[in-house]
Amino acid sequence: MRFNIDEWEPKTTIGRMVKEGQITDIDYILDNNLPILEPEIVDALLPDLEEKVLDVKLVQRMHKSGRRARFRATVVVGNRNGYVGVGKGKAKEVGPAIRKAIAQAKKNIIRVKRGCGSWECGCGTPHSIPYKGYGKCGSTAIEILPAPKGVGLVAGDVAKAVLGLAGIKDVWTKTFGETRTTYNFAMATFEALKSLNFTRTMEKHKEKLGIVEGRVL
């Protein structure tokens, strides 16, 4: 369903500022570490966001009244141009579980640092990543490494979905531990992308590596 900002009634200060046009760029929120507590904030500022359901599982737990079953969904959202988020949601039915996961993924949105860090390439365009990143979730870990143009996403399906929606076209990956848990694998990949933002780069190297944070116009 297409988002209509006129029908949105924001519940937070940031939400009201977005609706009133005082905040018009998602980067302002991310640069100032402002909390995104409403998924509609992302809907308003990143209207080209795509959603992909990675996994829906039936999970059961014992309760004093008997066995209770719920659905757990894992979702990734991204605009294929420098922004991505991962989330999970639980509910008694599939639809609400997916909607909860989408909402959480939007609230977890990050800006992705891209570039060309492969010594085999050196084209200076943001088709890959500028240097290696590492992420871990539970017993799952992943290392992402710069790759030359044309290699593609050398990764498992879950990591490929996260990297693709982030706007990365070429990358090598190494995985460690248990990769069969979809949510952990997706979150480990998400954390690896997030880790790229913690490395500072000198200005003279930024141009050489073609580093871009967020969208490429």
Curated annotation (Swiss-Prot):
Gene Ontology cellular component terms for the protein in this record: cytosolic small ribosomal subunit
One Pfam family hit: Ribosomal_S5
Single GO molecular function: rRNA binding
Keywords: Ribonucleoprotein, Ribosomal protein, RNA-binding, rRNA-binding
Gene3D superfamilies named in the record: 3.30.160.20, 3.30.230.10
Disulfide feature: none
Self-association state and partner proteins as the record states: Part of the 30S ribosomal subunit. Contacts protein S4.
Function field: With S4 and S12 plays an important role in translational accuracy.
Family: Belongs to the universal ribosomal protein uS5 family.
Protein name per its UniProtKB record: Small ribosomal subunit protein uS5
Organism for this UniProt entry: Methanocaldococcus jannaschii (strain ATCC 43067 / DSM 2661 / JAL-1 / JCM 10045 / NBRC 100440)
Gene: rps5
